Amino acid sequence: MRQANWLVSCEQWPHFQGGFGQYFYLRPNHAMFVLPPEITDEMTAGVNCAYTQVYAGLDIAGLKAGQTVVVQGAGGLGVYACAVAREMGAGRVIVIDGIDERLELARQFGADTFVDLREFTTPEARVKRVKELTDNWGGDVVLELVGHPGVVDERLRMTAPEGTYLEIGNINVGWKAEFDPSWIIFGNRRIIGLAHYEAEHLRGALDLMLRTLTKYPWRKVVSHKYPLEEINRAFAEQDKGHVTRAAIMPN
């Protein structure tokens, strides 16, 4: 089952295993779920690569009721993380970002406290602010969803003793991060990297979405739609940070 759900290059036979394709090959034992009519295609566009990843990450991290979750980055992954953390019982959800529309959407998805990058402009200031908001404790679970190695040390320093640093954003091979490993050891902290998840995580994520359809604005996560011939513009505008999640509409 693990092999069935693992990434395989589209260069390998039978090739139809990548995005933006007309066909997709399902290997033996590949898990599939039938969507209820209440969940639209638009709402599920980010379920596989975003929503279920943060669901699985918070589940594996062992988030407990009343704990504090810190979310770095309020893009698609970040706003999903806010709702999942809230539904898993987080007592406080702190979001770090600097774009108004992203901060507002995060609020609609359950975030209650914000660290604005335009106000807290240095790593030291942001770490200090998170500590102030948590009685000098830090986040019990801290999610890195930005995808830049320069934030790794900063996120670790705002992770509480016996807390979990959840790394989902840094997917670029070859990039390096520098941090003090003693911070992990003396605080009994742990680092979890996550890209893949089990079928039960997808089931749980879909169930959560279904039961909270009127609580969170799931339809707003896909903020921009592009025809297939404008796919390059979609990527360019996504990189600017003002597109929460882009959808490519086939002809």
Where are the predicted features?
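Short helix-loop-beta connector
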Residues: 38-40, 62-68, 136-137
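Adenosine-nucleotide cofactor-binding segment
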Residues: 71-74, 86-154, 174
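Rossmann-fold dehydrogenase core element
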Residues: 163-164, 178-220
